[in-house]
Amino acid sequence: MTKEIIKQKIRKAVEENPYKKDFRKVSLFGSYAHGKPKKNSDIDILIEFQPASKIGFFALARIQRDLEKKVGSKIDLLTPNSLSDFLKQEILQNAEKIYEKR
């Protein structure tokens, strides 16, 4: 799949997700964002939630499963707090926004 097709599928999956009201921003990073995915690459997605959101581990797992089902690929779903300090700044600066709550 091309990067644009992946972004379209993610955008559609986000729009249909029951937790959408809690999403602040959803971005693509990693090999697909750089246009260099390998055959077995997963899709790296950074999700930022509204400040008042109470999304826990199980809800995050449901969001990930829903995205995987609708996109048709393995998803690595991360939040800014789950990023390693070593890579955090680079990922936050270079991630490609797919969805942002208006």
What residues fall within each predicted segment?
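Catalytic core of pol beta-like nucleotidyltransferases
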Residues: 1-25, 34-39, 50-102
